[in-house]
Design a protein with these regions (language model features):
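Short, small/acidic-rich helices and loops at N termini and domain boundaries
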Residues: 1-10, 141-147
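TOPRIM fold recognition
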Residues: 54, 70-151
Length: 151
């Protein structure tokens, strides 16, 4: 639903990877052997409904977005995937119209800086949701631990 298969070649060898599209026509790509992008690099915006949402969930990477979907988090809200904390400036034009911005960012220095940058721009509209996965690096790690504990 959110991803596609991308086929590519390097030095005559054929490979495939998961592709996650961004708003500029590029893709974030992941495989067992490779993590990168097909330019241009930009944010990804997912709107599950035709009607406008007042809430947008923000994720650092698409694996965290997919983890949230698997956990049933933010299903009715719009979602913005930064695809790199360096893209926080590109996110601003997409986040302006939301009344609440729920941040599911990594529990590291880059995630904290990104959260502070968003709070500096949007103030009280920004909500830090990382307490949900406290003790984990990110939402994807939390999902993996949760799934492992349920086995």
């Amino acid at each position: 639903r959110h991803c596609c298969r991308l086929n590519y070649g390097v030095r005559g060898k054929r490979y495939f990877a998961i592709g996650f599209p961004n708003v500029a026509g590029g893709y974030e790509i992941r495989s067992r052997y490779f993590k990168g992008c097909v330019p241009p690099k930009d944010v990804s915006l997912i709107k599950p409904k035709d009607t406008a949402s007042d809430v947008c969930s923000v994720f650092e990477g698409f694996m965290d977005f997919l983890s949230a979907a698997a956990l049933g988090i933010g299903g009715n809200s719009d979602s913005l995937v930064l695809n790199s904390v360096a893209n926080v400036g590109k996110a601003v034009k997409h986040l302006d119209g939301y009344g609440r911005i729920d941040c599911f960012l990594d529990c590291d220095e880059a995630g904290r800086r990104t959260l502070e940058a968003l709070k500096g721009h949007y103030g009280g509209r920004v909500c830090d949701r990382s307490a949900l996965y406290d003790g984990c690096k990110d939402l994807n790690e939390y999902l993996q631990l949760t799934a492992k504990n349920e086995q």
